[in-house]
Each structure stands twice: as C-alpha cells, then as structure tokens.
C-alpha cells in the first residue's frame, strides 16, 4: 500500500489534544524531553539523515511506529509515540486483560499527525495488560506488547529495581576510542548502554535531564548573551508560538535525531520518566541565563506534552 504525505497540516481540533491539566495530574511535575532547532542547509541534510538512524533492532515488529515511550502509575497509562508517516485520523490504543478489552483514542501531539499520545485511566493496580496500536479502521500499526501498572500505595512489594541515567541527548557524534571522540557519542553506543540497563529488567527508568543539547546562546567571553553558532543558523521566530509553521518543523528536526532513534521501541514495556535540566531549556545554565526567556520556556514546555 502506498501513502502520499498530505500537503496541509491537520487543522486544530481541540478534542484531539490532551488537556494540560490531565498531563499535570498524571505526571505530577515529571515529563518527557524533546526540543531543538537548526534550519540551515547543512543541518537540514545531516539531521534529516540522523532522523532515520536505525532504532534498537530486536525481535519485535514496530510497524510504522518510530518511537514509543510509556509512563504508568497504579491506575493509569500514558503512552507517547511517533510514526514514520502522518496519520490523518486518530489512532487507537487497544488494552486487553483477560476477557476485558477497551479502546482509547489518541490525542494529537503536533499539527501534522506524526506525534500522538494515549491516556488510559481506571486500570487495575499491579496488573499486566496487552497493548496494541491500531489505525482508525482497526488495522495494526505495530505488534502487540505487554505493559504493567504499578502496585497500589497499599501494597508492599518485596523489591523494586529502577534504572537511573542522565545526559543521554545530543546529535550523532563520532567515537574513535577512549578519550577520542568528535561531538557526542554515536547513537549506537548510547543504545548499547540503554540496552545493558534494560537487561536488568527494571520496573521503571528515570532519565535525569539533558535529553537535548542545542544551546541557543553563548555565555562566555565578550559575546556573552549573543546567539551561539547554532542559534545564528537556526530559523526560529522568537516572537512566535512554537507549534505550527517553521518553529515546529525546526523543533522536530533537531529533537527527532536525539530521541526517536535512541529509544525506538526498546522501552515499550518499561515505564520511563523524563526530568528536565538546563540544556532542555536550550541553554547551558549560568547565572546569566535566568530567568529563562519566554520562547525557550515555551520550547521546554512544548517538549513535555
């Protein structure tokens, strides 16, 4: 089956978007990280290529799912995902346990239909569910997978194992040996580190900040406060909103290569929680960087949704 990418953005339909209050109630301050922008000719080409870096290869059919990141508590599931092509109609999350089945319609997370999230409530604590993603016609978008809710506060598990890590972001770099690299570690090496952590079968993972490295200003020397080379080459309209137009395209272009190929679908059965740090607000923190400029604050907030 062939697919032609639509020329127009999806029109804003308020019921397609998850209300901010629900996100805050669910995550209670923790959130996922995504950000970035750089729209000159060279970054467009290089970052577009990185966008398609092969995610973690495994014996599971990801279909058209580019990346999938779940979070849970004892009665709720929140799944954020992106697809290799835009979906013009809302996909659905199918949740099964024993003889019980329910369908949860996706909330649109961008304006083009590539990014969606699914929010399910009133689930049972400490219960494994079988999940699957479907298009609006019921066709499978990927293979099924298991995901468990957390125990209730009244339960007393004998043990828990949590994976903690930090500073996993950054565009693709080169590694030649110990102490010899250019830029960030290659995605393949970061994937191996995460897979090693997942091999210990943690019940959850916490990514402690710096998911995106794309500082827009420099804060050293005579040029303190001026746009960095990345900032000069970016195409941001700092007076405009983040979502829609070139600002959204720029954010996706820089964020995609730092998130989607790194995680792929490897964490589909491991709830992961993203905390934000300085670089997730588009700066390397300094006394001069506060308060965070309005536009960069909107970037940070947008990447949490």
Predicted feature residues:
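N-terminal export signals
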Residues: 14-19, 25-46, 126
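N-terminal, polar/Ser/Thr-rich
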Residues: 26, 52-53
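Acidic, low-complexity intrinsically disordered regions
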Residues: 12, 34, 38-40, 56, ...
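Divalent metal-dependent phosphoesterase catalytic cores across multiple superfamilies
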Residues: 53-305
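Short, cationic motifs built from Arg/Lys/His that form the positively charged side of catalytic pockets
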Residues: 23-24, 82
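N-terminal secretory signal peptides
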Residues: 1-22, 48
């Amino acid at each position: 089956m062939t697919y032609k990418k639509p020329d127009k953005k999806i029109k804003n339909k308020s019921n397609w978007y998850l209300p901010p209050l629900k996100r805050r109630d669910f995550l209670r301050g923790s959130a996922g990280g995504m950000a970035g922008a750089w729209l000159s000719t060279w970054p467009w080409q290089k970052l577009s290529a990185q966008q398609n870096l092969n995610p973690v290869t495994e014996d599971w059919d990801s279909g058209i799912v580019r990346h999938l990141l779940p979070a849970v508590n004892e009665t709720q599931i929140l799944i954020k995902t992106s697809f290799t092509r835009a979906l013009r109609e809302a996909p659905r999350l199918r949740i099964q346990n024993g003889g019980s089945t329910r369908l949860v319609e996706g909330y649109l997370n961008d304006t083009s239909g590539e990014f969606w999230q699914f929010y399910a409530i009133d689930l049972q604590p400490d219960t494994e569910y079988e999940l699957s993603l479907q298009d609006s016609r019921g066709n499978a978008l990927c293979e099924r997978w298991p995901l468990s809710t957390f125990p209730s506060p009244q339960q007393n598990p004998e043990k828990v194992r949590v994976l903690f890590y930090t500073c996993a972001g950054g565009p693709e770099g080169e590694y030649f040996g110990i102490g010899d690299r250019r830029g960030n570690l290659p995605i393949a090496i970061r994937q191996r580190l995460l897979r090693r952590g997942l091999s210990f079968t943690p019940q959850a993972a916490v990514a402690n900040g710096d998911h995106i490295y794309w500082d827009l200003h420099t804060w050293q020397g005579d040029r303190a406060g001026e746009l960095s080379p990345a900032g000069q080459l970016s195409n941001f309209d700092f007076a405009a909103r983040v979502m829609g137009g070139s600002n959204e395209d720029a954010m996706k272009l820089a964020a995609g290569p730092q998130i989607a190929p790194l995680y792929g679908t490897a964490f589909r059965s491991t709830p992961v929680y993203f905390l934000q740090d300085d670089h997730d607000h588009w700066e390397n923190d300094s006394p001069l960087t506060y308060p965070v400029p309005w536009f960069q604050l909107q970037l940070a907030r947008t990447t949490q949704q």
